[in-house]
Amino acid sequence: MGTVSPELMARRGIIGALVGAVTLMLGGCNPFTNSASYRYRMTVEGTVEGSAVYEVLAEHTRTVILADEKPGGSMLRGEALVLRTASGPLFLLLKNKESTEGLFSAVTHALTPDIPAGGHDNFWKAVNRLGGWTANAKADLPREDWPLIVRFRDLNDPKSVEKVNPGAVGLKRIVVETTSDHVTTGIEERLGWLSSQQGSFVRRLSVPDPTNPPIAAILNKYDFSTEIGN
């Protein structure tokens, strides 16, 4: 690893001080960062139907000062979409087979197919467009990007969570579209234990094969909601 010269350290210190001073003067606003967001409604069609509203937020740093500084960040707000069935509720999580970022990136690309997928600059461009006043986008979410679906054998026992095959419960289509509606909340009314849950539902090291853990050892409360307390 190379060393940093005193001159460069001093320069970084001056830049940091200037950025900090400007940030304080603007009441906490970073003058080098833009933010954008949009909301979308996800609607499930099939034997069981339902919908929920989510919000995607993104930040874009206009001026990257340091080599290891990221060009921006992103996150998803919302809660698992709940579908009512005769055998109990199903939950479409805030992640697909990849991750939470995998889900909202897939939704964003489905709504802006003309913008190439991948890379923060492309993602920022898409979110910025979808958050505009005239945004009116609607699309089918490809099946390979669908959220993970789970149910609980016992709603009062997080360890009883199990994965559900969408075809087995009659899910045929998922549609996403931009909206100005409020983000869906209220999942704690169904899962009263969720807000106090710490870590994964089952400790990963406690399962027979930690390299191939059950879904209960992978999931945590933030896969169900971003709107509950820590």
Where are these regions (language model features)?
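Alpha-helical transmembrane signal-anchor/signal-peptide segments
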Residues: N34-G46
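Structured domain cores in non-transmembrane regions
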Residues: E49-S160
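Glycine-rich, aromatic-bearing surface loops/beta-hairpins
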Residues: R153-N230
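Hydrophobic helical h-region of N-terminal Sec-dependent signal peptides
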Residues: L18-L24
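C-terminal motif of bacterial Sec signal peptides marking the signal peptidase cleavage site
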Residues: L26-G28
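Bacterial signal peptide processing site
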Residues: N30-F32
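N-terminal export leaders
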Residues: M1, M9-I15
